[in-house]
Design a protein with these regions (language model features):
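A polyampholytic, Gly/Pro-enriched intrinsically disordered region
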Residues: 116-136, 231-238
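Conserved Lys-Pro-Asp/Glu-containing loop-to-beta segment of HAD-superfamily phosphomonoesterases
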Residues: 127-171
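A short secondary-structure junction signal
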Residues: 91-93, 113-115, 175-178
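Mg2+-dependent phosphoryl-transfer enzymes with acidic/Ser/Thr/Gly-rich catalytic loops
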Residues: 13, 158-263
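Alpha-helical substrate-recognition element adjacent to the catalytic core
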Residues: 1-111, 205-207
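Short, surface-exposed connector motifs at secondary-structure boundaries
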Residues: 68-77, 156-161, 181-183
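Amphipathic coiled-coil/heptad-repeat helices and related helical stalk/stem segments
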Residues: 59, 148-149, 172, 194
C-alpha cells in the first residue's frame, strides 16, 4: 500500500504530466494502482472505507436537531452534500441517510463489480451546477437539458436566499461566492490545520461567518445557524405578506390598515 502522501504524490504527478483534471487523475490512479496490487476496487470496498471516517463533534445528531428547530420556525430543512471526495466513501460514513442527495465523485462499475471509469467528477468550479440543480429541483445529473432550460424565479424549488452553504476549503470558494452574490449565506468551518486559510476567506469577503468545526448543541456555530434559519423564516413571511397585499390590491380588496409613518 501507500501512505496518503505517497498516493497523492503519484496522482498529482500523473495529472500534471498529462494536463489532466486533478480529480480525474486521482480516480484513474486509484483504478490503476488497485489493479496492479490485486485490490478489488468495488463499491462495497469503498463504502467500507467510509465507515472509518471520524465525524466532527456533534455531527451525528446535528441533522435531527436543526431539522427539529426548523419545524418550530415553520421551515422544512433539507441537507445536500457537494464534495470532491468519493460518494461511495461518504455513503459509508454513517450520516449519508440524512442527505436528500449526495453530489460527489463516483465510479462506474463493470460487470465484475469493479470500478472501471469515473462516472461523476465534482471539481472546484462545476460544484456550482449542483447548487443550480438544488435551486431548480432538478436533482438527476443526467437531466442537463432540463437544468439549462429557462425557469421563472417563482417556479424554482429552493430560492438561493433560502440556502446556507457550509464548506471548509478552497474547493468551496466558487459556491461560497455564488451564495453571497445571490443572497444566500456562506459559512466556513475550520480545524487548527486550516484555520489561517478560512480566516482569509472571511477577510476577503468570500464567506459571511467562520467557526470551529464543532456542531454540538449550544456552540456558536449551532446558535448562528439557528439565527440564520430564523432570519430566513421571517424574510419568507414578509415576502409572502407583500405578495398577498399586491394580489389584493390588484383585486381592489386591500383592507384599510393603520400603518407606521416615517418622519
Amino acid at each position: 500500500g501507500y501512505t496518503p502522501d505517497e498516493f497523492w504524490s503519484i496522482a498529482n504527478r500523473f495529472g500534471f504530466e498529462n494536463r489532466m483534471d486533478g480529480l480525474l487523475a486521482y480516480m484513474y490512479t486509484m483504478i490503476e494502482e488497485c489493479r496492479k496490487k490485486g485490490i478489488r476496487l468495488s463499491r462495497d470496498y469503498l463504502v467500507s472505507c467510509g465507515r472509518a471516517i471520524e465525524l466532527f463533534p456533534g455531527v451525528s445528531d446535528w441533522f435531527s436537531r436543526i431539522n427539529a428547530f426548523g419545524e418550530t420556525q415553520g421551515v422544512e430543512i433539507e441537507h445536500y452534500v457537494l464534495s470532491s471526495g468519493l460518494r461511495e466513501i461518504i455513503e459509508g460514513s454513517g450520516v449519508s441517510h440524512e442527505f436528500k442527495e449526495i453530489y460527489a465523485c463516483e465510479f462506474f462499475y463493470n460487470e465484475q463489480g469493479l470500478a472501471s471509469w469515473p462516472k461523476l467528477d465534482v471539481n472546484f468550479t462545476n460544484k456550482t451546477q449542483f447548487v443550480y440543480r438544488i435551486n431548480k429541483g432538478i436533482l438527476d445529473v443526467a437531466k442537463d437539458k432540463e437544468l439549462n432550460a429557462s425557469m421563472p424565479d417563482d417556479s424554482k424549488r429552493i430560492p438561493f436566499t433560502n440556502m446556507i452553504y457550509i464548506g471548509d476549503g478552497l474547493s468551496d470558494v466558487p459556491c461560497m461566492k455564488m451564495m453571497r452574490a445571490y443572497g444566500g449565506q456562506a459559512v466556513a468551518v475550520y480545524q487548527d490545520s486550516n484555520r489561517a486559510g478560512v480566516e482569509d476567506l472571511l477577510a476577503k469577503g468570500r464567506v459571511d461567518f467562520i467557526f470551529p468545526a464543532d456542531y454540538r448543541d449550544g456552540t456558536l456555530f449551532d446558535t448562528t445557524m439557528k439565527n440564520i434559519v430564523r432570519k430566513m423564516a421571517i424574510a419568507d413571511a414578509l415576502a409572502e405578506e407583500n405578495q398577498q397585499q399586491l394580489r389584493a390590491l390588484g383585486r381592489g380588496e386591500l383592507p384599510q390598515q393603520m400603518g407606521l409613518l416615517g418622519w
